[in-house]
């Protein structure tokens, strides 16, 4: 039997999904020892799994190891809600699973740049239609805008010339005697 706090928490999670068009869930805090196969078998108890994405590290020291979360699409909303109610907070090996409605990440433009051209600012309607990566045309516009800014303000972008060679100061001091190995004392 669930406590009142767990019931309220699950109710708030379920109500958050009412605006969802799909039936996609995010499952997090997955123990690294749980395999993709075992997770799919666990999820199939709640309904027909339409799509399952188990994420792995692509590079770095943890390359090939699970990221600790996955996404799952169920065929119906009821199946997804039942999975949230049953799996959220459930202990799986050594960790409690966290199950939530999945939501798309919003593109947050870099605000640190002073003079970003208006052509690169994503509008709210375009941000939903475009994929997360910039198109080739947008990249070309960005490079052209940067070149134009560099032409207008050459002082802002001047740096050391690529062909500058700083010659070391001429040392005219010479040894009074040439270096000989037998002058060195043996150190060990």
Swiss-Prot record:
GO terms for molecular function: RNA binding. Residues 23-104 form the RRM domain. Residues 177-188 have a biased composition (Basic residues). PROSITE patterns: RRM (PS50102). Gene3D superfamilies: 3.30.70.330. Keywords: RNA-binding. Residues 151-188 are annotated as: Disordered. This is Probable RNA-binding protein 18. The lineage of its organism: Eukaryota, Metazoa, Chordata, Craniata, Vertebrata. The gene is rbm18.
């Amino acid at each position: 039997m669930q406590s009142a706090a767990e019931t309220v928490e699950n109710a708030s999670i379920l109500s958050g999904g009412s605006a969802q068009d799909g039936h996609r869930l995010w499952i997090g805090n997955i123990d690294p020892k749980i395999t993709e196969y075992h997770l799919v078998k666990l999820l199939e108890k709640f309904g027909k799994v339409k799509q399952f994405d188990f994420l792995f590290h692509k590079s770095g020291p943890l390359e090939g190891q699970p990221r600790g979360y996955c996404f799952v699409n169920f065929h119906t909303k009821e199946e997804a809600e039942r999975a949230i109610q049953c799996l959220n907070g459930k202990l799986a090996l050594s960790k409690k699973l966290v199950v939530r409605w999945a939501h798309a990440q919003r593109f947050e433009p870099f605000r640190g740049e002073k003079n970003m051209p208006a052509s690169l600012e994503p509008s709210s309607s375009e941000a939903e239609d475009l994929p997360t990566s910039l198109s080739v045309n947008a990249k070309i516009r960005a490079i052209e805008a940067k070149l134009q800014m560099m032409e207008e303000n050459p002082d802002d972008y001047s740096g050391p010339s690529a062909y500058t060679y700083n010659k070391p100061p001429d040392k005219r001091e010479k040894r009074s005697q040439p270096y000989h190995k037998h002058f060195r004392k043996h150190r060990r």
